[in-house]
Amino acid sequence: MKTYFQKPQEVQRKWYIIDARDKIVGKVAEKVACLLRGKHKEVFSPHVDTGDHVIVINASKAIFSGKKETQKLYSAYSGYIGGQKTFSPVQIRQKRPNFIIEHAVRGMIPHNRLGRKIYTKLHVYEGSDHPHAAQKPIPVTLD
């Protein structure tokens, strides 16, 4: 019996929606990364993009476990001397509430060309409104 690899044009992509309200950031990101990569499908292979589109709503209301809300730091470097800045999750939430979920998911998918393509199927929204109602997204609960 030959091994079957699904071609990218044969993939049936679905849309999923996850509500991040009062959910732990890492658990949301883990589920999102799994759906984006397509690891929940029987035809998954690591070198083919078999994943689905994922919508995350209420990203600004996701929580951290433990003391990460006060102790965790995100860093950014401008490339100039003295250009390294650190931000706490509280500061990030004020400026870009979607960044926390996006950053966590980005760390859980491959860091290569395929990962960049997979990442384009992630849609994160601060509130509960999103423009993808026409796609009829399937609600996903975190177990």
Curated annotation (Swiss-Prot):
Record InterPro entries: Ribosomal_uL13, Ribosomal_uL13_bac-type, Ribosomal_uL13_CS, Ribosomal_uL13_sf
CDD domains linked to this entry: Ribosomal_L13 (cd00392)
GO CC terms in record: cytosolic large ribosomal subunit
PROSITE patterns named among the record's database cross-references: RIBOSOMAL_L13 (PS00783)
GO terms for biological process, alphabetical: negative regulation of translation; translation
Keyword Protein biosynthesis applies: no
This protein's UniProt keywords: Ribonucleoprotein, Ribosomal protein
GO molecular-function term, one example from the UniProt record: mRNA binding
Pfam family for this entry, one: Ribosomal_L13
The keyword Protein biosynthesis appears for this protein: no
Subunit structure: Part of the 50S ribosomal subunit.
Role played: This protein is one of the early assembly proteins of the 50S ribosomal subunit, although it is not seen to bind rRNA by itself. It is important during the early stages of 50S assembly.
PANTHER family the UniProt entry points to: LARGE RIBOSOMAL SUBUNIT PROTEIN UL13M, RIBOSOMAL PROTEIN L13
Family the UniProt entry places it in: Belongs to the universal ribosomal protein uL13 family.
Protein name: Large ribosomal subunit protein uL13
Protein source organism: Methylacidiphilum infernorum (isolate V4)
Taxonomic lineage of the native organism: Bacteria, Pseudomonadati, Verrucomicrobiota, Methylacidiphilae, Methylacidiphilales
